[in-house]
Amino acid sequence: AIEQKKTEKVQIEKDKNLKETSLEKLKLKEQQLSAQLKEDERKKQELKRKVDVAIREEINKAKQREINRQKEKQRKKEEAKKGKSTQNTKTKNVKNDVAVNTKKVVTAESSEGSATGKNFANNKGRLPWPVNNGQITERYGRNSHPTLPGVSTVNNGIDITCSSGSKVRAVFEGEVSSVFSIPGSGKVVIIKHGGYMTVYSNLQEVYVSQGSKVSLKQSVGSLVNEGGVSSCHFEIHLISNGLPETLNPSLWLGGR
């Protein structure tokens, strides 16, 4: 009986040590997850900051282009008026024709962006995915952490987990507005489509440069390899009244 009690006591101590070890491992894992979450959040905030800066720079450039266009329009208008008062009828007619033709060209160029934006808007719910395959693993807006209770993150776009090194493609025709890198998060491409902009990040390689014209489904880069898989981060922004606004990409994407 004494030996049995000794054996039971030893077993109890073993069970206690095992529980303590398991608890320590669990705490360590939680600490590691928390540290990883903080690092991921830091990368997200850096991405948000750089995307916001890039989009606002593009907005300011567009405003300046419009100011310059209006100035040029006014200058030509004043030149045409001056020509009417100093030249004969034939010369005046020639100058009027030139002024009218120039005006048509400027109007066509200035309306190109708005036409592209309108076409983009008309394709809501029908845009192709930025990658050929994969599943959405983090949705737009607030997301609960899968393993840390009570912890959530906010996503300005969506994350699509797909095959390692997958190619990323433009969801609509447009012009590359920005290309930049974020340490630890790969490279980022921003494409403007009139009053809309799309963001593609976590790229290892980039196939386009700032100012490049891109077509529908054109490859813009390939994704970083993350342990045998890749994750494509994708955002859509609307420029409204000179300010950027994030949109839910899931409402805009259709078939592959």
Predicted regions mapped to residue ranges:
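Alpha-helical oligomerization segments with coiled-coil/rod-like character
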Residues: 1-94
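Zn2+-dependent peptidoglycan hydrolase active-site motif and core
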Residues: 153, 170-205
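Terminal peptide-recognition signature
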Residues: 26, 136, 160, 174, ...
